[in-house]
Structures are given as C-alpha cells and as structure tokens.
C-alpha cells in the first residue's frame, strides 16, 4: 500500500489513521532518512491512541512510554550502533503498541510480525509505503487498505 503525503499534516493524518487501528501487541517500524517525517507520523499515531501533551522524539532517551487508551512505547534507535543489544528496552511487550524509528539498527531483535511504514522524499512531498510481515500485521494492513 502506498500513500502520497503532500505535507506534514498529511503525514500526521496518516499516523492518526494507523493509530486508530492499533491494538496492544502491534509493532510499527518507521523507516526513512533524517527529516522524512517519522516523528511527525509517530505523533499522529500517539494522538489516535489518546496520548495527551507533547510527544517528543525519543532520540536521546531511546524509549519513551506514553499513557493512552493503550500504552505506547515510542523508540528511536538512531543513536545505537548497528546490532547493539536492545533486549532491555521492552520492545517485545504485548500489552502496548510499540513504535520504532530507525529499526534498521537492530531489526533482528525486533518482533518478526510487524508493520513497516517507509517514508521517502518525493520533492514536493513524501510517499509512505506500508508493508506487513506476519499474519497479525497483514490483517492490520488489509484493514488500513479499506
């Protein structure tokens, strides 16, 4: 599934659409270059999950847990060395929605069943390409495609 996003509001709106469909145990991986809109999309997800207040980038904290209709774990692995251990970050929790920016730093340690949102610059906007690995997130992607 692809979506063209004309501006940051469209990126946040896609995040809200995704967030409205998420349930505990879902894992969403956000990929894209610096400035691609990962954190903007994450903020949209957070709003749809009922997170109030500021949703900062977790770049320096690595993981920030937010309270909402379900807990949201928002992680940013950018500062980690590739392959660095992440077992103690709680990214395998099934009682929360897990949202990971820069998952390529340690993809092998993340849940195998997940949704990927790849953001790319298109000059006058962005393109979001969504794909799922595993049956649970394939069902999520099918629901988002309707």
Show which residues each predicted segment covers.
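Hydrophobic anchor at the beta1->P-loop junction of P-loop NTPases
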Residues: 28-30
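P-loop (Walker A) phosphate-binding loop of NTP-binding proteins
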Residues: 33
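Conserved lysine of the Walker
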Residues: 38
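Conserved nucleotide-sensing/catalytic segment adjacent to the nucleotide-binding pocket
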Residues: 56-59, 65-105
């Amino acid at each position: 599934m692809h979506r063209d996003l004309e501006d940051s509001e469209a990126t946040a709106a896609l995040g809200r659409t995704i967030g409205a469909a998420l349930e505990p145990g879902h894992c969403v991986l956000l990929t894209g270059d610096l400035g691609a809109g990962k954190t903007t999309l994450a903020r949209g997800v957070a709003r749809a999950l009922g997170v109030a207040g500021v949703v900062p980038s977790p770049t320096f904290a690595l993981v920030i847990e937010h309270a909402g209709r379900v807990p949201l774990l928002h992680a940013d692995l950018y500062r980690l060395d590739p392959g660095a251990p992440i077992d103690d970050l709680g990214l395998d929790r099934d009682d929360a929605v897990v949202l990971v920016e820069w998952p390529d730093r340690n993809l092998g340690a993340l849940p195998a069943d997940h949704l990927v949102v790849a953001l790319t610059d298109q000059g006058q906007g962005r393109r979001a390409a969504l794909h799922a690995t595993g049956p649970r997130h394939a069902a999520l992607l099918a629901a988002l495609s309707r």
